[in-house]
UniProtKB/Swiss-Prot annotation:
Keywords: Cobalt, Lyase, Manganese. It is an enzyme of class 4 (lyase). GO terms for molecular function: manganese ion binding; myo-inosose-2 dehydratase activity. Its EC number is 4.2.1.44. The keyword rRNA-binding does not apply. GO terms for biological process: inositol catabolic process. It catalyses: scyllo-inosose = 3D-3,5/4-trihydroxycyclohexane-1,2-dione + H2O. Belongs to the IolE/MocC family. Signal peptide: none annotated. The gene is iolE. This is Inosose dehydratase.
Amino acid sequence: MNKIWKLKNVKVGVAPILWTNDDMPELGGDISFDRAISEMAQAGYQGTEIGNKFPKDAKILLRELKKYNLEIASAWFSGYIISDFEKNFQDFQKHCLFLKALGAKVVVFSEQTYSIQGQNKPLFKDKPYFTNQEFENLAQGLNKFGKWSKQHGIELVYHHHMGTGIQSLKETEKILELTDPEFVSLIFDTGHFAHAGEDIVFCLKRLISRIRHIHLKDIRKEKINELKAKNLSFLEGVKQGIFTVPGDGDIQNYPLFFELLAKNNYQGWLIVEAEQDPRKANPLEYAKKAMDYLRSLISW
């Protein structure tokens, strides 16, 4: 039996993508906002991240979340620092002020210049790469974005992501080395590192000092092999069931992962996030399954 590790100053949430996929409305498009947040609370979660079906008015959103005692942990922001800095900076400022009004402390940033994550292109074959100059430009921009957000009480966490210029451990380490730790931190996504062929415990050891937010997923290796063999896109892989909730897939070293988080005194949110087809994977059942698995390994 695994030891249960105590994580202090940690909250556990679940992302709305279990219920509705914003990138593929055919996955859960019929599931209402209220059903999603009520089931999050029913499964025992403390908070969530913002999805497309969430009210755009902060007061209305807070009122709805209060019914279920849920908080907003963060929200995704699509970055275009490399290709359209000025407009992106304005959009980022608005986004951060909205998050601040909701009581969130973290903004999830992912550079989408050249990204193929939403395109019908082979995920591994057509993965984009940034030049050294683009890395430098991105780092300078991230420092500016992160400095501004910090002044407004929001921490910028960079999201390494499949199908983007920062996908691997090596690419993630490069952008962290080029940025100021005072202004740029990391969101560690177990599913995206595992999907990229990385070992999550090895990555955690390398990156722990910069991690301020965590997404927890699991992967099905046979589905990744199928994606590679058939040259499928990222979204096609999601539809095939590459991702699932922690404990339901092929990541074997979650016990050690949580032990390292505890020993390094990780503070922040743990967000269960596993995009699947809700017709095949009932969201409430999978949210509960993930919660049961987490409670077998950690307390908070």
